């Protein structure tokens, strides 16, 4: 979406029952082995900093059904944002053979996330508006996206909720992952 979509989204969401709303800064670094072992397995590994808390997350291969992305993920609280160890990685997922090389940072994302937890129909839907940047070496790319997560309830409620969005252009659905 375009950056001016934030105000439109915020105004639109005010017509629904908002259970929670907050803005946080998220710093993420994504890691893989030099041979791209994790990417070849359709997995992603990141360290996320949220305030003073750090979480190691492994996202495994998922599925896309009707445009809805479902991807299992495993989390581990860690003390800092240093390069994840083999021990940490194997505590998240039962890998059979990991490369002997050290994990290396691939890229980072820094963004502000404003999220709303909305009661809609028989469901709870999280709406997140992310605005920031992707960093890889000397290159940067802006991030400006809206994400929806069905926290509880019916997939049909999620699709109905999204169909009510006030955007007619500059918006597209994607199951792409960072």
Provide a role label for each language-model segment:
Residues 1-178:
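Phosphate-end processing signature that detects enzymes handling 5′-triphosphorylated RNA
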């Amino acid at each position: 979406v375009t950056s001016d979509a934030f105000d439109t989204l915020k105004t639109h969401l005010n017509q629904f029952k908002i259970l929670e709303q907050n803005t946080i800064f998220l710093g993420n670094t994504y890691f893989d082995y030099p041979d791209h072992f994790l990417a070849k397995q359709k997995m992603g590994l990141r360290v996320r900093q949220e305030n003073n808390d750090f979480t190691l997350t492994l996202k495994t291969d998922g599925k896309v059904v009707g445009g809805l992305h479902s991807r299992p993920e495993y989390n581990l609280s860690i003390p800092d944002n240093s390069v994840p160890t083999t021990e940490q990685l194997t505590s998240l997922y039962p890998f059979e053979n990991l490369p002997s090389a050290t994990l290396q940072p691939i890229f980072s994302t820094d963004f502000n996330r404003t999220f709303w937890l909305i009661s809609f129909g028989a469901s709870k839907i999280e709406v997140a508006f992310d605005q920031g940047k992707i960093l890889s070496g000397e290159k940067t790319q802006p991030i400006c996206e809206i994400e929806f997560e069905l926290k509880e309830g019916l997939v049909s409620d999620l699709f109905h909720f999204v169909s009510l969005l006030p955007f007619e252009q500059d918006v597209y659905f994607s199951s792409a992952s960072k």
